[in-house]
Amino acid sequence: MEKVLKNDWGPLLAPEFEKEYYRKLADFLKEEYSTHVVYPKKEDIFNALEYTSYENTKVVILGQDPYHGPNQAHGLSFSVQPGIKTPPSLLNMYKELRDEYGYDIPNNGYLVKWAEQGVLLLNTVLTVRQGEANSHKGKGWEHFTDRVIELLNEREKPVIFILWGRHAQAKKKLITNTKHHIIESVHPSPLSARRGFFGSKPYSKVNTILANMGEREIDWEIPNL
């Protein structure tokens, strides 16, 4: 298990790697990766934290667990690798973006552009077995990603948390610092998007908050590849 985070998350999260829960998780993952197909690739597990440093995090979009189909997951919530069909929830995110800003829906679901601007695309569970959603639930990742949220909660500079759906909203209890902002609605999944995701304007809400803070706004437009 690669556990060296090369930016400022490294020292902040170093104590987690020594804890009993993480040792058990690492043993479990070693076994899983050697006996099953697991996503994402080992070197991509911590991509959300690698792309978006602690200091540079402006926004957090919380997901659940990685996509479990071939070549989809690469360590960023909701994002898929280039050349892979855009999944339904992300397509609905793009439709809302089109309605807010008039952007064309891109031909890909590769969200690295967001991550590089300070949007932490964090799943609460960072690995999954091929074809088995939630197969790595309850193995220790939740402790680790809760710590990520707690560390952001401790930060002086405000963070905007986007919580879509009940799973993400359950993490509200970790966000106790009133400096931070929470934007929430139902999940963009086709099962729920029409019950309050469409029309919720999360992207422009984020940029209004950032502008009021004197911060650079997020350019949400994803280019075609």
UniProtKB/Swiss-Prot annotation:
Top-rank taxon: Bacteria
Record-linked Gene3D superfamilies: Uracil-DNA glycosylase-like domain
Catalytic reaction equation(s): Hydrolyzes single-stranded DNA or mismatched double-stranded DNA and polynucleotides, releasing free uracil
This protein's record includes keyword rRNA processing: no
EC category: hydrolase
PROSITE patterns: U_DNA_GLYCOSYLASE (PS00130)
Active site: D65
SUPFAM superfamilies reported for this sequence: Uracil-DNA glycosylase-like (SSF52141)
GO cellular component: cytoplasm
Family: Belongs to the uracil-DNA glycosylase (UDG) superfamily. UNG family.
HAMAP family linked: UDG
Name used for this protein in its record: Uracil-DNA glycosylase
Organism, scientific name: Bacillus cereus (strain ZK / E33L)
Gene behind this protein: ung
